[in-house]
């Protein structure tokens, strides 16, 4: 199944999986202790990973068609907080994730996508350091007690 494409106008189009459902993120409801890894620098040929712990508390909203989580961590000795609001559109069968954090204190462009079984893929077209990019959020809930989230960034060629 094709998840997304960039059309002739340069717009991102995302396609829902037939099995996409408002219950796709139910596995994430509750309190989590998370072990994270991130690259020290993005899009700079960096291969140095930084590891850190965080907590996450996720609750249902809007009769199960949305959820919200609060992410808390410490980076370089400073407290860091983030919130994600996830909304499911029953007409399009697409999820939209809106993220804000204590660094930017504003919402990022929404990630949009769906789950196909245990695998969720959500996409966003954005700009990073003046370069147009596509961001992929990849969720794997195959092991419901240890779900895995990862992020990939691809630079769009002009």
Where are these regions (language model features)?
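Hydrophobic/aromatic beta-strand elements that line small-molecule binding cavities or substrate pockets
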Residues: 53-59, 73, 82-87, 109-113, ...
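Short beta-strand segments and strand-loop junctions that repeat across beta-rich extracellular domains
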Residues: 25-28, 34-44, 88-90, 146-158
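Helix-adjacent hinge/juxtasegments
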Residues: 73-109
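Residue-level recognition of beta-strand termini and adjacent short loop/turns
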Residues: 62-63, 143-145
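Amphipathic/hydrophobic helical signal segments and adjacent flexible N-terminal regions
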Residues: 1-49, 57
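Short beta-strand segments that buttress and anchor functional surface loops
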Residues: 69-74, 97-100, 122-127, 151-153
């Amino acid at each position: 199944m094709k998840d997304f494409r960039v059309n002739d106008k340069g717009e991102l189009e995302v396609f829902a999986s037939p099995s996409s459902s408002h219950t796709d993120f139910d596995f994430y409801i509750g309190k989590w202790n998370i072990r994270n890894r991130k690259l020290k620098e993005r899009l700079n040929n960096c291969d140095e990973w930084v590891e850190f712990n965080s907590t996450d508390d996720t609750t249902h909203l809007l009769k199960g068609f949305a959820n919200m989580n609060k992410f808390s961590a410490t980076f370089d000795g400073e407290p860091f907080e983030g919130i994600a609001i996830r909304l499911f559109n029953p007409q399009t069968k697409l999820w939209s994730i809106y993220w804000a954090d204590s660094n930017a204190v504003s919402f990022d462009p929404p990630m949009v996508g769906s789950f196909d079984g245990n695998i969720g893929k959500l996409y966003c077209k954005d700009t990073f350091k003046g370069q147009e990019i596509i961001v992929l959020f990849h969720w794997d809930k195959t092991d419901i007690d240890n779900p895995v989230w990862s992020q990939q960034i691809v630079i769009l060629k002009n």
